[in-house]
């Protein structure tokens, strides 16, 4: 490998917790399901010039494996089963599942294969892309600058929260996928550990090494895949919610609400689901409007909102988190997941707005119709129309 291309990743656990949580559920319920996913850059960055360097990193990823101490640590967690962990010990990334190309300056990446394997590519691959691009673009930037920025933010945060009861404020690191570098994320998390309101990280490797609580449940792909797994499209979201409870009947109970808009989600989120799930996660649309809808829904079902948790994770920074905390903290339990604004906040460094999203399940289209129109992803306009009809949604403006 060249100097710039020393391996970004050093652990199979350098990923978001929900990837392993979903992978276990797929392993037990949908072992033979096949999927395809695609990379998207939501900004105007032309990243195609990094295709060769990224391809080199992908080849290096096949050497990652679950180490014995990592296996032992996962085994001590309450929600992993022995059959899955034994399978995970043998898991290796297969670079043949990934195609990378430079399409007139645009970076094109497509993943395809068994869902149980493909599911693990997304987060580490995005972290690789982010770190490789920043290595080339911002070689002068370093950990000290990231830490200085955080310290300045924490001073502002202290002033902002002076006199405020912060006993119900809980912050999590969600910064793996778009971090400046692995080193920056670890440094930021170590500093945040000193704060009483910092409760954990979505990164399993950091959680293990820093004795933190790993955070995460499921992502959009869980709901998207059920659009083709479920025989009835209109029932697919309920099928996804029910299958999750089969795998995790009394833990990991935060449900993501915006795969097919919050309104469609709440229509499916009846009293049984609302009682059994511990709470909801916001990832698109207006957060105050969303939170008010969630609280009203719980009340309508006769459930005390104080017994539930709302997790906010959409484009948050510390200031936004405090605003939401002021608005909601007396009525519901709260957690805040901050990603890019913690792990890629360095002067003169432009964070990447990059995602990898499911586009097919068993050879058929799937879609994400979130509460932010710009986040909609699907190639097949006919399927988008069918999905909107099945969930009684108004006409879509544009799928991107």
Curated annotation (Swiss-Prot):
Q: How is it modified after translation?
A: Transiently phosphorylated on a His residue during the reaction cycle. Phosphorylation strongly increases the affinity for substrates and increases the rate of nicotinate D-ribonucleotide production. Dephosphorylation regenerates the low-affinity form of the enzyme, leading to product release.
Q: Is Phosphoprotein among the key words of this record?
A: yes
Alphabetically, which GO biological process terms does the record hold?
Answer: NAD biosynthetic process via the salvage pathway
Q: Which domain of life is it from?
A: Bacteria
What InterPro entries does the record point to? N/Namide_PRibTrfase, NAPRTase_N, Nic_PRibTrfase, Nic_PRibTrfase-Fam, Nicotinate_pribotase-like_C
Q: Name one GO molecular function term.
A: nicotinate phosphoribosyltransferase activity
Query: Which Gene3D superfamilies does the entry link to?
Result: nicotinate phosphoribosyltransferase (3.20.140.10)
UniProt keywords (A-Z) are:
Ligase, Phosphoprotein, Pyridine nucleotide biosynthesis
Stored PANTHER family: NICOTINATE PHOSPHORIBOSYLTRANSFERASE
- What does this protein's UniProt record list under function? Catalyzes the synthesis of beta-nicotinate D-ribonucleotide from nicotinate and 5-phospho-D-ribose 1-phosphate at the expense of ATP.
Give the protein's recorded name: Nicotinate phosphoribosyltransferase
Lineage of producing organism: Bacteria, Pseudomonadati, Pseudomonadota, Gammaproteobacteria, Enterobacterales
């Amino acid at each position: 490998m060249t100097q710039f291309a020393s391996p970004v990743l050093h652990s199979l656990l350098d990923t978001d917790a929900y990837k392993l949580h979903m992978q276990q559920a797929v392993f037990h319920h949908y072992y033979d399901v096949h999927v395809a996913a695609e990379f998207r850059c939501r900004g105007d960055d032309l990243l195609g010039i990094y295709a060769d360097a990224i391809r080199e990193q992908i080849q290096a990823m096949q050497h990652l494996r679950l180490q014995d101490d990592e296996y032992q640590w996962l085994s001590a967690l309450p929600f992993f089963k022995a059959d899955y962990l034994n399978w995970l010990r043998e898991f290796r990334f297969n670079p043949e599942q990934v195609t990378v190309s430079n399409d007139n300056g645009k970076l094109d990446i497509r993943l395809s294969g068994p869902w149980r394997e493909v599911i693990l590519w997304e987060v580490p691959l995005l972290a690789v892309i982010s770190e490789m691009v920043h290595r080339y673009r911002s070689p002068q930037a370093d950990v000290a600058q990231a830490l200085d920025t955080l310290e300045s933010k924490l001073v502002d945060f202290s002033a902002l929260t002076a006199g405020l009861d912060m006993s119900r404020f809980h912050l999590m690191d969600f910064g793996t996928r778009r971090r400046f570098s692995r080193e920056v994320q670890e440094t930021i998390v170590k500093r945040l550990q000193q704060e009483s309101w910092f409760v954990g990280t979505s990164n399993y490797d950091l959680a293990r090494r820093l004795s933190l609580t790993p955070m995460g449940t499921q992502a959009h792909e869980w709901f998207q895949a059920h659009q083709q797994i479920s025989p009835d499209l209109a029932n697919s979201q309920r099928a996804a919610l029910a299958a999750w409870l089969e795998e995790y009947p009394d833990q990991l109970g935060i449900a993501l609400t915006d795969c097919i808009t919050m309104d469609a989600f709440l229509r499916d989120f009846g009293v049984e689901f609302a009682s059994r799930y511990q709470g909801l996660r916001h990832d698109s649309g207006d957060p105050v409007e969303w939170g008010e809808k969630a609280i009203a829904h719980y009340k309508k079902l006769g459930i005390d909102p104080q017994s539930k948790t709302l997790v906010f994770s959409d484009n948050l920074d510390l200031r936004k988190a405090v605003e939401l905390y002021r608005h909601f903290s007396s009525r519901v339990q709260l957690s805040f997941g901050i990603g890019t604004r913690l792990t890629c906040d360095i002067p003169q460094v432009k964070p990447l707005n990059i995602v990898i999203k499911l586009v097919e399940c068993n050879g058929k289209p799937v879609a994400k119709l979130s509460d932010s129109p710009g986040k909609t992803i699907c190639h097949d306009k006919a399927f988008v129309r069918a999905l909107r009809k099945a969930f009684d949604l108004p006409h879509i403006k544009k799928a991107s």
